Amino acid sequence: MPSVDIDASQWQKLTQSREKQTTVITPLGMMMLEIQGELELPKDFASLARRDSPNEGRFSEQDGETLIRFGSLQIDGERATLFVGKKQRLLGKVTKLDVPMGIMHFNSKDNKVELVDVMKYKVIFKDRPLPIM
């Protein structure tokens, strides 16, 4: 069976220093979002990305890929609110994962795997989006 070594040096650096910038996007670390349904992206997002102003910041580029910021996540204890655009919001609940999940970066060029972060929580959005009035 094929195998590959996993480099955990990045994870060790993150756990040894609180000052290092990480992939963590919430006070609870990197989180999984579980939503009902689909997020619909604009069909012409490439042209929208070219016209995006720095003030809006909806689009960015990383490793040659266009990334779309579709919302803003706010966490208050065990409750979470995801604002999607300027018209909808989702209300959700923060739950701890039974088994933490590792976030890995696979580099196919040199056949290496790097442990980037460990996810311990997820946010579950069970209901349909609510309109913002």
Curated annotation (Swiss-Prot):
It is found in: Nucleus. Keywords: Cell cycle, DNA replication, DNA-binding, Nucleus. GO terms for biological process: DNA replication; maintenance of DNA trinucleotide repeats; mitotic sister chromatid cohesion; telomere tethering at nuclear periphery. InterPro entries: Ctf8. GO terms for cellular component: Ctf18 RFC-like complex. GO terms for molecular function: DNA binding. Its main location: nucleus. Belongs to the CTF8 family. Essential for the fidelity of chromosome transmission. Required for the DNA replication block checkpoint. Component of the RFC-like complex CTF18-RFC which is required for efficient establishment of chromosome cohesion during S-phase and may load or unload POL30/PCNA. During a clamp loading circle, the RFC:clamp complex binds to DNA and the recognition of the double-stranded/single-stranded junction stimulates ATP hydrolysis by RFC. The complex presumably provides bipartite ATP sites in which one subunit supplies a catalytic site for hydrolysis of ATP bound to the neighboring subunit. Component of the CTF18-RFC complex, which consists of CTF18, CTF8, DSCC1, RFC2, RFC3, RFC4 and RFC5. This is Chromosome transmission fidelity protein 8. It comes from Saccharomyces cerevisiae (strain ATCC 204508 / S288c) (Baker's yeast). The gene is CTF8.
